[in-house]
Design a protein with these regions (language model features):
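Short beta-strands and strand-coil junctions in structured, solvent-facing domains, enriched
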Residues: 44, 48, 131-132, 147-148, ...
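Non-catalytic, conformational "gating/processing" segments within enzyme and secreted inhibitor domains
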Residues: 56, 105-141
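M16/insulysin-pitrilysin zinc metalloprotease superfamily fold
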Residues: 25-56, 194, 206-209
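Solvent-exposed, non-transmembrane alpha-helical starts
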Residues: 32-34, 69, 136, 190-196
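Non-catalytic accessory/assembly modules
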Residues: 50-57, 64, 70-77, 129
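Hydrophobic face of alpha-helices
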Residues: 1, 35, 53-56, 60, ...
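Non-catalytic beta-strand/loop surface segments
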Residues: 1-30, 65-120, 144-190, 208-209
């Protein structure tokens, strides 16, 4: 962060169910520095016990504020867990509290070593740059990094049900809340001409007002 700020840039990161993204925004002459930073992040991260202990408490507090003390967020989390019974999509991005309590720095190091690898990453560069320059930088900074053996997650199919599922949860809240969800077609590279996912996306906005 200090290096990026000293060079007039800004940076941030975010995590979703499918990937974690790190990004920088700065003047194009700093592009080589961006590749250097991300190359170091990919394979040279230092994970100390002291830093882990401090940061895991920050994550626990974030979970408490955003989910545990927020009835609506907590309900959505329970809904996802009920809807996806075999898929990782049923797990909260921030993690369950019990997992955060039992996590050790060794768990973090194992995850980092396994998944932070050039054969498990996508590099996106947008702006006034030349493709040849970008490919050369990618080769320079990532080409020499050793790949990892990536564990492919193939969860079993979701169990079929005929009459639906329902679950009632109790939480301190001013008003009751209700969520209903439906399994629906998804956008797939195997069937790019399928229009139904897009129609259902529009329908959801219409029904939501």
């Amino acid at each position: 962060s200090q290096i990026i700020a000293a060079n007039g840039g800004s940076e941030n990161a975010f995590t979703g169910h499918d990937y974690t993204a790190y990004f920088q925004q700065w003047e194009k002459s700093r592009l080589p520095l961006s590749f250097e930073i991300e190359s170091n992040r990919m394979r040279n991260l230092l994970l100390s016990e002291d830093e882990f202990i401090k940061e895991i408490e920050v994550v626990k507090e974030e979970r408490r504020m955003r989910t545990d003390d927020n009835p609506d967020a907590w309900l959505y989390e329970q809904f996802g867990f009920e809807a996806w019974q075999t898929s990782p999509y049923g797990q909260p991005i921030i993690g369950w509290r019990k997992d955060l309590d039992s996590m050790a720095v060794a768990d973090l190091a194992d995850w980092y070593k396994r998944y932070y690898a050039p054969n498990n990453a996508t590099v996106v560069v947008v702006g006034d740059v030349m493709p040849d320059e970008v490919f050369a930088l990618a080769e320079q900074w990532f080409g020499g990094l050793a790949p990892s053996e990536i564990e492919v997650n193939n969860p079993p199919p979701e169990p079929r049900f005929e009459s639906g599922r329902e679950k009632t949860v109790e939480r301190a809240a001013r008003v009751p809340s209700f969520i209903r969800g439906y399994y629906a077609p998804v956008i797939s590279a195997d069937n790019p001409e399928d229009w139904e996912p897009y129609a259902l996306e529009v329908l959801a906005y219409v029904l939501d007002g």
